[in-house]
């Protein structure tokens, strides 16, 4: 019994520290130093309505919008509670059929030349909010035609919303799909 008492006390102490004090402290620091990120990097309109997050992709399939990277999350696409890829190998016949269908859809939308991999294949998380600038620019002609605006206006908007590598060296340039689509709506209103 004398060996069990210290073990139980340590268990209770570490549960309080690791399960209560530490998470509360880290959350408090995050809210103090990074309030926007701690709340999910939400995009909120002028009326206070949440439109989405800079960190989670959303489905867009209408021709007047920038199309995101495909999502294969469980139940429905871009489901943040079921983040994950399909785990299908690149030689899986179902996977190859799905990729071929996506490429066909992109070709039918007017896209020519090499199709960037990110427009035909889902990511590991299934929630990517970004595209490469090249993948975004390839969609400019379709978006401009659907909206009845010059392609140069769409290209300019994509360029304005292109972020470079993090800290100048980490990753590649990227375009946030939701941010561009929200700004596209302001161009044609």
Swiss-Prot record:
The keyword Nucleotide-binding applies. It is found in: Cell inner membrane. The chain crosses the membrane at residues 6-26. InterPro entries: KdpC. Keywords: ATP-binding, Cell inner membrane, Cell membrane, Ion transport, Membrane, Nucleotide-binding, Potassium, Potassium transport, Transmembrane, Transmembrane helix, Transport. GO terms for cellular component: plasma membrane. One of its GO terms (molecular function) is P-type potassium transmembrane transporter activity. It is a single-pass membrane protein. The system is composed of three essential subunits: KdpA, KdpB and KdpC. Belongs to the KdpC family. Part of the high-affinity ATP-driven potassium transport (or Kdp) system, which catalyzes the hydrolysis of ATP coupled with the electrogenic transport of potassium into the cytoplasm. This subunit acts as a catalytic chaperone that increases the ATP-binding affinity of the ATP-hydrolyzing subunit KdpB by the formation of a transient KdpB/KdpC/ATP ternary complex. This is Potassium-transporting ATPase KdpC subunit. It comes from Trichlorobacter lovleyi (strain ATCC BAA-1151 / DSM 17278 / SZ). The lineage of its organism: Bacteria, Pseudomonadati, Thermodesulfobacteriota, Desulfuromonadia, Geobacterales.
């Amino acid at each position: 019994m004398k060996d069990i008492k210290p073990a139980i006390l340590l268990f209770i102490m570490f549960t309080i520290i690791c399960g209560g004090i530490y998470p509360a402290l880290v959350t408090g620091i995050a809210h103090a130093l990074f309030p926007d990120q701690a709340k999910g990097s939400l995009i909120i309109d002028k009326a206070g309505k949440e439109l989405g997050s800079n960190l989670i992709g959303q489905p867009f399939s209408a021709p007047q919008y920038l199309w995101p990277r495909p999502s294969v999350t469980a139940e429905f696409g871009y489901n943040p509670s079921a983040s994950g890829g399909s785990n299908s190998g690149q030689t899986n016949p179902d996977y190859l059929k799905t990729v071929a269908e996506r490429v066909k859809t992109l070709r039918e939308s007017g896209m020519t030349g090499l199709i960037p991999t990110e427009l035909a294949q889902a990511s590991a998380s299934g929630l990517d909010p970004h595209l490469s600038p090249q993948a975004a620019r390839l969609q400019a002609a379709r978006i401009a035609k659907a909206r009845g605006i010059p392609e140069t206006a769409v290209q300019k908007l994509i360029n304005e919303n292109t972020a470079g590598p993090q800290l100048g060296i980490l990753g590649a340039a990227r375009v946030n799909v939701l941010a561009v689509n929200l700004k596209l709506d302001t161009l044609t209103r």
